[in-house]
């Protein structure tokens, strides 16, 4: 692991070698906006903004991307809910349960699945207010997601409205699926077959499928 310093909390960002090419720009962009976004109480706390940068990218095939952290109790790991109370991860687990037949589980975490990096486009929000920090993170968000897409085969974005123009923001030729948000009304996410489709797309790209059942916690 490597680390760099920034002028505001969290003061130090620890990161895996695979993120090295973007770190100078990240530091520059963060120092520009940190004083603005740190005026608010944030979810997650600043020490957890950059936790996912500890993840390697060279072994990832799929990025599962949400728009921003839970407005309360964000852990820095996208979709993670240690007490398994958040609707989004419960809906994701339910979808994977239908796909895999696994039923006796106590939780689900995308971050423990081989080949998958869960990501949030914006890395924080004001406590209780989703998408409230979008304007501050915008440059950093594009920089980091663009870097991720150089490594993965499939980018799966959750939220048809939030990600309607995501392809225009990407410079890498990555296969992109824009699906329903897990909390979408009329149970639209339930009918979404994206987790299956991802494995078909990986196969077409001569990559190993994702074992989605690995994410279950018992």
UniProtKB/Swiss-Prot annotation:
EC number: 3.2.2.27
UniProt keyword DNA repair present: yes
Record InterPro entries: Ura-DNA_Glyclase_AS, Uracil-DNA_glycosylase-like_sf
GO molecular function, one term: uracil DNA N-glycosylase activity
UniProt record, GO biological process: DNA repair
Residues of the active site: 68
EC class (word): hydrolase
Keywords for this protein: DNA damage, DNA repair, DNA-binding, Hydrolase
Highest taxon above the source species: Viruses
Keyword check for DNA-binding: yes
CDD domains linked: UDG_F1_VAVC_D4-like (cd19372)
Catalyses which reaction(s): Hydrolyzes single-stranded DNA or mismatched double-stranded DNA and polynucleotides, releasing free uracil
Disulfide links within the chain: none
Purpose of the protein: Plays an essential role in viral replication as a component of the DNA polymerase processivity factor. Excises uracil residues from the DNA which can arise as a result of misincorporation of dUMP residues by DNA polymerase or due to deamination of cytosine.
Similarity comment: Belongs to the uracil-DNA glycosylase (UDG) superfamily. UNG family.
Subunit structure: Homodimer. Interacts with protein OPG148. Component of the Uracil-DNA glycosylase(UDG)-OPG148-polymerase complex; OPG148 and UDG form a heterodimeric processivity factor that associates with OPG71 to form the processive polymerase holoenzyme.
The protein, known as: Uracil-DNA glycosylase
Gene behind this protein: OPG116
């Amino acid at each position: 692991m490597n680390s760099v310093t920034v002028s505001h909390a969290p003061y130090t960002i620890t990161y895996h070698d695979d993120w090295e090419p973007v770190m100078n720009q990240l530091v520059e962009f963060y120092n520009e906006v940190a004083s603005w976004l740190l005026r608010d109480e944030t979810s997650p706390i600043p020490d957890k903004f950059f936790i996912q940068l500890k993840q390697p990218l060279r072994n990832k095939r799929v990025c599962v991307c949400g728009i921003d952290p839970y407005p309360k109790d964000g852990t820095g790991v996208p979709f993670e809910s240690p007490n398994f109370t958040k609707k989004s991860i419960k809906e994701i687990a339910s979808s994977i349960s239908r796909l895999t037949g696994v039923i006796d589980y106590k939780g689900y975490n995308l971050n423990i699945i081989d080949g998958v990096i869960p990501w949030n486009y914006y890395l924080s929000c004001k406590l209780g207010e989703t998408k409230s920090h979008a304007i501050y993170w915008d440059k950093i968000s594009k920089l980091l997601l663009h870097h991720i897409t150089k490594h993965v085969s499939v980018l799966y974005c959750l939220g048809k409205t939030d990600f309607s123009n995501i392809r225009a923001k990407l410079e890498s030729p990555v296969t992109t699926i824009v699906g329903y948000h897990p909390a979408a009304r009329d149970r639209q996410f339930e009918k979404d077959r994206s987790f299956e489709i991802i494995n078909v797309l990986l196969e077409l790209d001569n990559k190993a499928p994702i074992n989605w059942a690995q994410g279950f916690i018992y």
